[in-house]
């Protein structure tokens, strides 16, 4: 499962430290053909940047999508080892949280789990990132929430998606990316679908 704002294509186009998963696996299988596997990269991105692979009334049912849609589709279209003993769920960053979350909630579907890059999810992770402790970030969030309250209700979801897209386009890894991730995190773990944009 990819991390926050990571596109599935980044696993094969070299964006992630030159990684091309296709070449890596081909080289591995050339020396160990008995270690066959089907690798599926599940898209967990949404309009706010990431779903955290949880079900949310604001951003959708990402846990269900992973377990109830992706797994059966792969089993129906490929020669798989069906059942939990034939499946490993792995993830990085947001995807690491998702892998642990989904695998623990669905032990009947996944027999193994691997997670890397969970820094944001430890006891002080959000503080260490500055998501809740940077005064400028907190101030910007409240100012933006007041502005969003003025949007016509029917335009709310589309305008919020545009707002998030602009944040990430301006600075996906810095301050603006942190602002966007705060909205995505809130929509996943503290959703308020009736509260208007940003729905947290």
Question: Where would I find each of the regions flagged by the language model?
Answer:
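Non-catalytic cap/lid and distal C-terminal segments of serine-dependent acyl enzymes
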Residues: 1-200
């Amino acid at each position: 499962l990819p991390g926050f704002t990571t596109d599935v294509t980044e696993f094969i186009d070299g964006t992630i430290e030159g990684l091309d998963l296709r070449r890596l696996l081909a080289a591995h299988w050339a020396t160990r053909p008995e270690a066959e596997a089907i690798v599926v990269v599940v898209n967990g991105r949404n309009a706010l940047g990431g779903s955290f692979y949880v079900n949310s009334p604001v951003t959708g049912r990402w846990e269900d999508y992973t377990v109830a849609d992706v797994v059966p589709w792969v089993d129906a279209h490929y020669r798989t080892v069906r059942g939990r003993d034939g499946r490993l769920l792995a993830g990085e960053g947001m995807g690491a949280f998702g892998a642990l979350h989904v695998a623990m909630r669905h032990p009947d579907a996944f027999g193994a789990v691997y997670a890397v890059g969970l820094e944001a999810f430890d006891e002080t992770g959000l503080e260490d990132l500055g998501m809740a402790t940077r005064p400028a970030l907190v101030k910007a969030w409240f100012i933006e929430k007041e502005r969003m309250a003025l949007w016509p209700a029917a335009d709310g979801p589309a305008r919020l998606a545009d707002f998030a897209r602009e944040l990430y386009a301006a600075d996906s890894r810095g301050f603006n990316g942190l602002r966007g991730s705060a909205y995505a995190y809130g929509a996943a773990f503290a959703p308020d679908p009736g509260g208007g944009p940003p729905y947290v």
